[in-house]
Amino acid sequence: MQLYNSLSKTKKTLNKKTINLYCCGPTVYNYIHIGNARPILLVDVLIRYLKSRSIKVNYLQNITDIDDKIILKALENNLNELEVSQKYTSAYLEDLKSLNINQPDKIILISQKMNEMIDFIKNLVDINAAYVLDGDVYFDIKKYENEYCKLSGYKLDELISGKRVEIDSKKHYSLDFSLWKKTDIGIKWDSVFGLGRPGWHTECVLLIDEYFNHQTIDIHVGGIDLKFPHHENERIQFIAKNNKELAHIWLHNGHLQINDEKMSKSLGNVILVRDFIKKHNKNTLRWIFLTTNYTQPLNISDDLIYQANKFFEKLTNLSKKTIQFIIKKDLKIKSINSSEYINKFNEYMEDDLNTSLVLSLIDLLIKQINKNIVDKNLDNFNLLIGSLNYILDVLGFDNVFNYKFDNKTKELFLKWQELVKNKEFNKADLIRNKLIEQGIL
């Protein structure tokens, strides 16, 4: 399988039977919005595909339950930080379920790893990769300036002149970033450096380092907005501590726009996942994300949502026609996992998750199944139905194509046909209403 690696700027081959994967999780101070959902859905589709190819995936995700934003939210609502973080952690897990996203194998709350975090930072200080100043701890970028910014592609002098970093006069170098923050505000822990809490960039790298036993992971996933400084700072800490790369492949998904505008609070166009699902459905967002390569920006327009609705409408109508055809022809449909269509699906997915071509393949299958039904053609019908069902299932679509039914439904449909044939329309209408409720007519 080939995936685009943001570090090398080339597609890289993934050919292992066990994959270690990390994806940045949410900071739990609010409900997640649809932009937050893009990398998580990307991972879900990737893992579902890898598992369909008998590849094992060890998937780790953090939940940042310690952060200035959480403290601010708590102060605004007269709550403590724990109440805020617990509320939105639960909400996040609910949203995953609502989107039919499989939970990671391991989710770790940052607050549960505070001792390990302190030890990790102390280790960086001990090897002179970081320094302590008045209770704060900073990473020493100058020691690793030949490695720093290889992921983002920035040049150090451009970052300084462009003010892409915080100005702090007490730091050795303006690009040095915080590993431990001395503070009297909000939740804090005692450490060898004094009272404070860890910096955000250390939280993720600590979990990767510990959970995957100090080894380079196969895939690191996150939004392109996190490439600098967050992922850059994760990477440099791991290199400093372990003298090796953090990840073989860095996957970054592109920005999200809403009707050609950046999604932002100031524009008032931020769409929460739960609000989107209420208005549309859980499958709509998945389809929208699959229309464009994950590395590219994606504009969610009213027209794109309309296209998504038409897609699911086609599948609903196809489900009805398929069930009717199977009953009329008394067919037995078997599940399959191999066909020319599935081979083509695998080919597209192996090429950096080319999901736009996969959606075209699904459209082709829908047209071919419809043609077979119209022509009353049984040739390859099981293969077509099985292929479509297999592909939709691997992509994670939930209950969008249904061709299965029980004997009671079959008997009801045949009875309805008989009544119509005998022109007993009043009785037929009673059964027809039941079949409509069941999604058969």
Curated annotation (Swiss-Prot):
A molecular function (GO) term: cysteine-tRNA ligase activity
Domain of life: Bacteria
Residues holding Zn(2+): 24, 204, 230, 234
Assembly: Monomer.
Classification of source organism: Bacteria, Bacillati, Mycoplasmatota, Mollicutes, Mycoplasmataceae
Native organism: Mycoplasma mycoides subsp. mycoides SC (strain CCUG 32753 / NCTC 10114 / PG1)
This protein's encoding gene: cysS
Name of this protein: Cysteine--tRNA ligase
GO annotation (BP), single: cysteinyl-tRNA aminoacylation
Cellular component terms (Gene Ontology): cytosol
